[in-house]
Amino acid sequence: MEQLNQINLPKVDSTNTFVRDMLDSGGVLPGITIVTADEQTAGRGQTGNSWESEKGKNIIFSLLCHPDFIVPPKQFILSQCMALAVQQVLSKHIADAGKEDVVSIKWPNDIYVGDKKICGTLIECDLMGKSISNCIIGTGINVNQMVFTSDAPNPVSLKQIIDADSDCDAMIREVVDLFC
């Protein structure tokens, strides 16, 4: 695996925006960089949607990688890899709690348990010639939040499913290990 750098922020507008600003200022670290946050004030989703996350309750991270071996028409593979990693981790935690809820992927970027959304991913890639120079993969997973106040139609958290708190830091490591 490539060098893995981690930046933990107590509060940020958006982890994807933070990584984008880091790229724009030339502050890129070698290898893979993961930016996590306890609180995100302007989390973004697809088509301008926002992502709600109660402070310290959920997984919020952006992973920056440099997949220059992937040609732009094949960039969907990055979304597939992240979705499969999240699906596998959530399925394991649900099964370990003795529950039988099915975790499914709604392509290209959402993870559902039953008919409720537990995770969303926003991917932003930079192209250079015929390859992808940078890819920011922002992921939000509802882990320990119990009340959702936004107008999102169907959110759910892992805690609502398994009736127990989960360790967000450990889950991030599980997802990243599977993705990388």
Predicted regions and their residues:
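Long, positively charged amphipathic alpha-helical accessory segments at protein N-termini or as interdomain linkers
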Residues: Q6, D68-V102, V113-C180
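N-terminal lobe of the biotin/lipoate ligase/transferase fold
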Residues: M1-G98, D165
